Structures are given as structure tokens and as C-alpha cells.
Amino acid sequence: MSLSMRDPVIPGTSMAYHPFLPHRAPDFAMSAVLGHQPPFFPALTLPPNGAAALSLPGALAKPIMDQLVGAAETGIPFSSLGPQAHLRPLKTMEPEEDVEDDPKVHLEAKELWDQFHKRGTEMVITKSGRRMFPPFKVRCSGLDKKAKYILLMDIIAADDCRYKFHNSRWMVAGKADPEMPKRMYIHPDSPATGEQWMSKVVTFHKLKLTNNISDKHGFTLAFPSDHATWQGNYSFGTQTILNSMHKYQPRFHIVRANDILKLPYSTFRTYLFPETEFIAVTAYQNDKITQLKIDNNPFAKGFRDTGNGRREKRKQLTLQSMRVFDERHKKETGTSDESSSEQAAFNCFAQASSPAVSTVGTSNLKDLCPSEAESDAEAESKEEHGPEACDTAKISTTTAEEPGRDKGSPATRAQLFPAEPSRARDTARLDKASPDSRHSPATISSSTRVPGADEHRSPGREGPVSAKVDEARALPAKDAFAPLSVQTDATAHLTQGPLPGLGFAPGLAGQQFFNGHPLFLHPGQFAMGGAFSSMAAGMGPLLATVSGASTGVSGLDSTAMASAAAAQGLSGASAATLPFHLQQHVLASQGLAMSPFGSLFPYPYTYMAAAAAASSAAASSSVHRHPFLNLNSMRPRLRYSPYSIPVPVPDSSSLLATALPSMASAAGPLDGKSAVLAASPASVAVDSGSELNSRSSTLSSGSVSLSPKLCSEKEAATSELQSIQRLVSGLEAKPDRSCSGSP
């Protein structure tokens, strides 16, 4: 029974083993079938006798019926064809032979390519890979909107020559080197429909050029021997390997295919643009090409003089400051003595927790500039000190509120005196003060400019006492380059509360040490008149004792107003009897600056020592315990910033207590009053101007808030100071602040 039932069954007609033969073979091209297969070719792994049947380039266009019939004729069992023989009909794929397109390609930025081509385009190649500029960008049209395309780019040798750049032109230097491994770059958006490709500019900006022959990026496909474009293995990746000093031609390819693995069996449409030809170099040979790249490439930071990073900005700031510094030096040595309109925008700010935050400006610019070797980590550490000081106090900064005011130039000097031999000798001695000026604290730096002639301020803003601000900047031209720098081992930090006081006579305000870096001191502690002995104690053996009978601040004034030979012999009373504006001009001519608010030493070394000796009885022991700050901890303050950072303003009563007795006994009424003004907790703002040419060192980017009440006895001299008042820029009067610091 069972045998009779099985006899009618034809062998091979069972559903499990019967091969599926479609009714209309042209509906199922091999390309359509492969498009829905995994990204490999398991169906093409045929035995040797049947390999030719399905491995031909045209196999993808053959109907599957023909392939199956051919396989049967060669004796291949259908089971060896694998799952290819059992595919169900696929209705979603359109036969490729029905797609008609006429692609057209247009090169983008053709004018820029032409400019480079006229001069001989060069492309830099590096071991890690360098992108092309101009980037290779094209716009496609004429593609079938529904069909999928793969867009590729490769770079081939334009000829078989090696080149060299000689006499400003490229010339043949011999036969080409052996060809590098072939490499093709596939656009990362591939495959995509024609509609997608035509809707945008196709850019190959991520392609990199390298000379690293061991580059392992990418993958390899084997192209059949009868492929129209290539034969053999061809690698695909993001980097193309080139030979230096060889000429190359980029090519653009369009392939209608929906799978990258079908590239070896697809038709390539290739497009050449002669203007994209270039020579591969390891460094640019033609300066014109370099300039073209700088002018047109927004990312050519390596060539451009100005960069966006901190180091680039700092470097350019340094170079500009040095140029201005040199120009000023030339003017000072010549007939003109003005440096009015050219000031470096180098604000090394140094605000501290003090009653009078004061004096930041352009000192010796070469030493103030942070070195190029400083790391960015150090630059970041410089910024960390800012927020600590920001929260504790409010600084009145009318300098930022009055941008119209010219802060640019110092007052006109009455005359120039030649440098005395003793001054030159002192300068030589001071040059030895800082063997390591690079690490000396260079933050509080007053103006070292030579006075110009066009400085002005709005009249009536300040009392006549503020005219001494001029004296703070009246430094001789020949002395503007030799600052004294002092190096100590004290470790007091800027934001660790009130620091030990270091008082200065008012006549010693507004200046700096003259040898490299200015001294980093507590700014508010410079305002104590007559407390100069603390500097003598703090500097130790650095200051030599100078013989003389000068007493107190007025004695210091007299030393400045006399000639160098007889300066030490004048009494304080004789100096105090001179009118204020005469004192100013005489002091300016001698190179000693006077100011109602305190800062650093004036230039003449003998004056400093004399003042230190004269005021030795005025300072308490706590004033000079730690007069200097730690060099390394305050180094981050050397950084330029266009913003002013608020700092704490502590109570100044203790500082006043040490300074006022000596002021009352030793100083004249004028100096005593100005010392009280400086001791008041008037905030002197650091210049907040961010212009590179801001002339911020006139008042060392800070001015004192003066009170008309404190200047009442000077109202008689107002008419004599009208011309001087127009030469001084400062903050508006703040009576409440000035009165709070007065006893």
C-alpha cells in the first residue's frame, strides 16, 4: 500500500527540495536579489567548475533563471547554490537597467581653485594626515531621484615625474618614485538617493593626505580583472597615501549602487577637474601659495600672526608692547619727548585687599610678558585667584564709567636733565638686585612712561592736591628702562586677609623698581606717609644708607627739588615753602615722582635710601614683618585681563595709626593732607579697558578719589592748577570714602 502510494511521486518534486523557479525571470535580477542580502556574498562561493557562471561582472544583470540553467548544464547540484535558489519574489526593488540618469558635476569654489592653480597648488602631507585646502567640493545634478548612488574620490598621479621648487617655480627633477598603495575615499553619506545628493554640496573635506605607507586605515576590496577602472585589490579609507614632491590629480566618481560591496561589479562615472591638480609637499615651498592659504583658510592658525588661544593672544600682546616700547625709546633719545598716543595695552593687574587699590601699568614690558613656554595650566591657575577676591569687597571704578576721558598721556615735563654719573652707577647696582627677574613678582607696576604733552582731565573733578598725580608719572626718559626688582622669600598670599603693612611716603608713589620686574607689594600699604622705614627694614641690605639731613616727607621733597650734588642738604622746611606746582615741576625735572596715593619707589636710588633713613622712626614692628609677597604664589597675577577684579577693602585704622604720627611731625601740611587722602579707603580701579592700544599706564590705570573737603585749604591755588588739572585723569570725588579714612 505504501509502495503504491509512493510510486506516483516524482523524485525531486517535494516542496522541501524543489527549486523555486520564478515565472518571469527578468523581474528578479541578481542585483535586486543581492541588494537584500547580508553585506557579504555567501551565494557566490561556488565550486571551481561553477565559479565562472556567477563571478562575471555582468552576473548582476543576468536573470536568475539563466544562472540557474547554466549551473544545471555544468552539473552543479541546486543545493550548492545555497539560499540563492530559494528566495521569494521581491517586489520592492526596481531593476537597475530601467534607471536612466545623466549625472553632471560642477566644482564648487572654482575661482579659488583657479587662483591656486595659476601659482601651482601645493598640499601639505604629514604622517598623521593633513586635510586639503581648498577642500574638494562638488555639486551634482541629473541623478535619478529614487536610485541610490555611492560617491567616491581618489587621487592619482598626474604624471611620472618628480618635481622640485627652484627659482620661484616648479620644475621636473627626475622620474617619479614607485607608486604608493591605491586608496579611495568613500563619502561617508554613501549610499544615498540621487535626490539627497542633489540637494546639497558634496564635500570631501575629511579626506586626509599622508605619506605614511604603513597606514592601516580602511579596508580592501578585490576588483575583477576586467573591471573598467581598476584591477586587483583596492583599499578604501579616510587617508590617501602620496609621495612628496609629486603631482597628483583628484578624481570624483559616481557609482549607481546601493551597497558598497557591489562597487567592484558596478560602473564608475569618473570626473576630472584640471584646476584641482596639486603637488604634494611636506612644507610649503611657494610663499604666494602660503599667503593664499592664510587669506582664505579660516583654520590656518599655524601661519596667522593672531590666534584665538591664550598663548597666541599673550604672544601678540607681548610683541605689540615691545614695539611700542622700542618706538618710545627712540623718541625719548631724539628731540621729541612725547609718547602720548602710543601706549601698550599690557595691563598686568595687581589688586589687593587694601584701603587704596592702586597702580597697574606698563613697566618693563619685556620682563612683564609671560614667557611663551608657560603652560596653559599655569594660565588657568592665574585665573583661579580672581574669584577669591571678587566676593569680599566692592571697588568703585569710575574709570570704566567714563570712557570718553583720555587716560592716555602723562603731563608735560618742564625740562630734561642729563643723567648724573651717580645715577648711572646706582642703576648698575640695581641691575644686580634680581638675578632671577623672570620669577620676580611683577604685578604692581606703575607708569614708566616719559611724559607727553596731551594728557588732560576734566577740570573741577579733583582738588589741587590731585595735581601730585602728575608727579607720579613724571619720570625722565633716560630712566624709563632700568627698574629695580626685589626678591624675597615671604609667603603671604594676596587673599589671606590683611597683610603686614608696608608704608610709603606720598612722594614715593606711582613709581616702580627699575630692574626687570616691579616689586609686588600690598598696594594699600603704600599710602602711609612717613612710614618709609618699613621698606628699609624689608629690603634689608639692599638699600644703602645715604648721608644727609633730610627729615620726613618734606625732606624727601627737598632732595628731589635740588640738584644731584646738593640734594641731600636741603631742609624739609625749605622744600615745603615752595608752591605746590613749583614742587611738581622741580620734582619732575629731577626724576622723582610725587603722588597723594602710594605705590613703589621712584627712580633715583639715593632718594630712596635717604627717605628710608629719614623715616626710620615712623614704622611699627608689625608694619614690615612680611613686606613682600611670595614670588611664585603671586606669579599668576601677571596675566592680562580686560576686567577689573574686586578685592577686599579692610579697615585702614591700624594702617593709619602707624603712619599719621610721623606725618604730623615730619611732613608739611601739604604732604600730611595728601597722605591722609591716600590712607582713606578710596578704591583705585584697575583699568578695565580692553583695547590693545589703550593708554592705561598714565595713572597706572588707577586714580584716587579725592574729597573737596580735605582740600579746602588748597582752594587758593586752584587758579594756578587749571592747566595741570586738564592733564590729569582720575575718578570722581567721593566725599564719603575720603572722609572715612581721615582722622
Swiss-Prot record:
Biased composition regions of type Polar residues, renumbered to the chain: 440-449
One Pfam family it belongs to: T-box
Gene Ontology terms: biological process: animal organ morphogenesis; anterior/posterior axis specification, embryo; atrioventricular bundle cell differentiation; atrioventricular canal development; atrioventricular canal morphogenesis; blood vessel development; branching involved in mammary gland duct morphogenesis; cardiac epithelial to mesenchymal transition
Keyword Glycoprotein: no
DNA-binding region listed in the record: 107-220, 241-305
Region span, Disordered: 371-467
InterPro entries: p53-like_TF_DNA-bd_sf, T-box_DNA-bd, T-box_sf, TBX2/3_TAD, TBX2_3_RD, TF_T-box, TF_T-box_CS
Keyword Transmembrane helix part of the UniProt annotation: no
Predominant cellular place of this UniProt entry's protein: nucleus
Function summary: Transcriptional repressor involved in developmental processes. Binds to the palindromic T site 5'-TTCACACCTAGGTGTGAA-3' DNA sequence, or a half-site, which are present in the regulatory region of several genes. Probably plays a role in limb pattern formation. Required for mammary placode induction, involved in maintenance of the mammary buds during development and branching morphogenesis in embryonic and adult glands; partially redundant with TBX2.
Subunit note: Interacts with PML.
Name of the featured protein: T-box transcription factor TBX3
Species of the source: Rattus norvegicus (Rat)
Name of the gene: Tbx3
